[in-house]
Amino acid sequence: MSRSFTYFLKDRDRPLYDQYVMERYTEGMTGKGTVTPEPKFSFEQPKFRTKDICDELEKISALNTTHPARRYLVDRGISEEHLKSLYYCPNFKEWTNAHKKIFKDTNNDDARIIIPLRDAKGDLFGYQGRSLDPTSRMRYITIMLRDEQKIYGLEKVNGTEQVFVVEGPFDSLFVPNAIAMCGSDVDLSGLNYQFVFVFDNEPRNKQIVEKIDSAINRGYSVVIYPKEVQQKDLNDMVLAGIDVQSMIKCNIYSGLKAKLKFNDWKKV
């Protein structure tokens, strides 16, 4: 078997064959009576998501490059890869009511970007609709299909590594292994993750200051922004050309050091 594999490799890829022979030589696997172990291949099982109501809609990535929904997200710096996980709904109220009666009527219906909320298995339990109308009084509408915590990104995180917690779904797209809280009443206690909280950079905002203080007191790690960063949220930082991932990595604090940095950062 090893002989046939060797000749197969020699016929198909001579440079790789030469490298293979050299590795065998350096490992003492050449010469008379030597048996080369058969190569072992490891394949990860493919993951398939169950179809859900979002599949009725068109993905943002499939829209024309001049489409307002696609342009809005591209202008915010969101990558093509992430556009594949967001959807466009031309009639938000009508589509929502077709699956769960939420609105009394569909008057003044509008088009919205659909941000799916999925659990760790990838099953849809809710969604947010982001209005494309800059004058809308309700920029975000959250619809829950099941009684779950309003968290975006659970299906994408690796729980064995640090999980970054940000304040909005779009911000989470700029940070690896991140989830977003889609409401002020989100309870993360049911998740056994090593959290790092990344709140907005608003040292004069009393609510945000209290949230950071609470996270530190509960023993969590937090990001405290350097004074030279003037932008309020991660999206604005990305648009300003800041390397957000490096900036976050270099400004994670916990315990007493977090307290000292926090007290120096806050303005209220």
Regions found by a protein language model. Name each.
Residues 1-92, 110, 134-136, 203-206, ...:
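Non-catalytic accessory segments of DNA primases and related replication-initiation nucleases
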Residues 189, 205-208, 232-235:
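Short active-site-adjacent structural elements
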Residues 195, 199-201, 209-211, 246, ...:
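Conserved catalytic-core subdomain
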Residues 245-268:
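Extended, charge-rich low-complexity interaction segments
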